[in-house]
């Protein structure tokens, strides 16, 4: 597995582990393939998290996502996760030009909203 990863991402700590519920995959790799874990970046791309956000924030995008048919077979799961991530990338993260000014404006707005304190009542 490590040789395969190195063919595409030879530099250590650059390749991301990605997939659906990828935390479980990471635990398996930690227990059984520590050299693979050592080569991977520490961050994960969990397609399930993106799916959950789409379900809550972009319901139509969630409802139109490609249907899975893999039956929880390893290769089918991998290919369907790639397909699902590509779908969400195109629908939720379009490649429209985003200016730094717009990004700064949104960042200011979000910061101005503040972070609610735990136990604080909503008005």
Predicted stretch roles:
Residues 1-123:
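Metal-dependent phosphoesterase core characteristic of DEDDh/y 3'-5' exonuclease domains
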């Amino acid at each position: 597995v490590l040789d395969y990863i190195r063919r595409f991402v030879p530099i250590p700590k650059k390749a991301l582990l990605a997939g659906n519920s990828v935390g479980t995959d990471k635990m398996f790799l930690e227990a059984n393939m520590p050299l693979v874990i050592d080569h991977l970046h520490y961050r994960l791309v969990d397609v399930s998290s993106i799916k959950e956000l789409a379900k809550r924030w972009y319901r139509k995008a969630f409802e139109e996502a490609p249907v899975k048919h893999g039956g929880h077979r390893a290769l089918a799961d991998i290919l369907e996760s790639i397909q699902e991530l590509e779908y969400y990338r195109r629908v939720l993260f379009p490649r429209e030009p985003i200016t730094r000014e717009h990004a700064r404006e949104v960042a200011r707005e979000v910061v101005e909203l503040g972070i609610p304190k735990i136990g604080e009542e909503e008005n």
